[in-house]
């Protein structure tokens, strides 16, 4: 539910919390079942606070052989944080996941997908092997600052389920309406075929509260 709370204080209602709570309560299990049926391993980007609030769910992901990567601490928008606040959010998130799983996460994705000019230098301070937050390419590449080299695995909004399937009743008109499922699947399959033919890196992003239902 942390994505709703970070978007706007107006979303701190039982309805919006319940939409987010569906993810760890039911959505994750549905996704794990589907992944197991097709023998697929995935990366789950987890906010640190989710590891604290839903430890059994996060442990189940890890014990099923999937990667746990970091998604901030409380799904903070890094564009609204000072450099020190960004460091604190990353460190708290790392601590929460490492305490629960026994492993330090090696991957990172920005909550809300936004940041400040300093953010990537800050991320590299924590020795992540890769980040997956930017939209400037369709193949992985290295980000270097002279001290640390990190792989960037770019993503695309049109391959994020939230873009099509999230519903919020108090969003502006025309925003966040649920799309026709067949159309969404057709979009994703067209992208997959094109990426395969062109030898690109296909990164699809699903959230338990949306695709998990």
Predicted regions located by residue number:
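Short, local alpha-helical segments
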Residues: 172-176, 204-211
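Catalytic alpha-helical scaffold of carbohydrate-active enzymes acting on polysaccharides/glycoconjugates
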Residues: 1-107, 112-160, 182-204, 211-213
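Glycine-rich, positively charged active-site loop/lid region within alpha/beta enzyme cores that binds
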Residues: 154-175
């Amino acid at each position: 539910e942390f994505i709703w709370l970070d978007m706007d204080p107006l979303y701190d209602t039982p309805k919006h919390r319940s939409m987010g709570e569906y993810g760890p309560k039911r959505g994750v299990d549905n996704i794990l079942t589907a992944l197991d049926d097709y023998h697929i391993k995935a990366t789950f980007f987890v906010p640190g606070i989710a590891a604290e609030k839903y430890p059994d769910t996060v442990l189940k992901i890890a014990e099923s052989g999937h990667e746990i990567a970091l998604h901030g601490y409380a799904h903070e928008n890094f564009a609204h944080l000072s450099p020190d606040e960004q460091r604190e959010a990353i460190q708290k998130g790392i601590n929460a996941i490492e305490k629960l799983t026994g492993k330090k996460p090696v991957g990172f994705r920005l909550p809300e997908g936004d940041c400040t000019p300093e953010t990537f230098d800050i991320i590299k301070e924590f020795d992540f092997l890769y980040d997956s937050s930017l939209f400037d390419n369709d193949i992985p590449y290295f980000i270097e600052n002279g001290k640390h080299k990190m792989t960037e695995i770019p993503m695309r909004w049109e391959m994020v389920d939230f873009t099509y399937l999230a519903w919020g009743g108090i969003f502006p008109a025309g925003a966040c309406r649920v799309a026709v499922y067949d159309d969404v699947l057709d979009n994703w399959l067209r992208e997959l075929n094109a990426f395969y033919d062109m030898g690109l890196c296909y990164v699809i992003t699903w959230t338990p509260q949306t695709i998990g239902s």
